[in-house]
Structures are given as C-alpha cells and as structure tokens.
Amino acid sequence: MRLAMPSGNQEPRRDPELKRKAWLAVFLGSALFWVVVALLIWKVWG
C-alpha cells in the first residue's frame, strides 16, 4: 500500500488544527493499546 504524500505547496483544504487532532487521536489510541497490552501481560505473569 502506497501513501501519496501531498507536497507542501498544494495543501488541500486541510486545517492544521484538524491534523493536530488526528495525530493526537493516533497517539492516544496507541498509548491506550499499549496500556491494555501491559495490563494483560501483568495479569498473565502476575
């Protein structure tokens, strides 16, 4: 799967605010996933 990266000069009607919220959501989702994984491992070996 190839991701087409838009070049800087042709930014299609995208908020920097929206992009920041998207990155924040990705970061929080990833952090939540790893917390759940750590808790499962802790319960298995606890």
Curated annotation (Swiss-Prot):
Subcellular location field: Cell inner membrane
Primary localization class, coarse: membrane
Transmembrane intervals: 22-42
Membrane topology type: Single-pass membrane protein
Cited Pfam families: YmiA-like
Superkingdom as given in the UniProt entry: Bacteria
Entry GO terms, CC: plasma membrane
Keyword annotations: Cell inner membrane, Cell membrane, Membrane, Transmembrane, Transmembrane helix
Induction context: Constitutively expressed (at protein level).
InterPro entries: YmiA_put-like (IPR047744)
Name of the protein: Protein YmiA
Species whose genome carries this gene: Escherichia coli (strain K12)
Upper lineage: Bacteria, Pseudomonadati, Pseudomonadota, Gammaproteobacteria, Enterobacterales
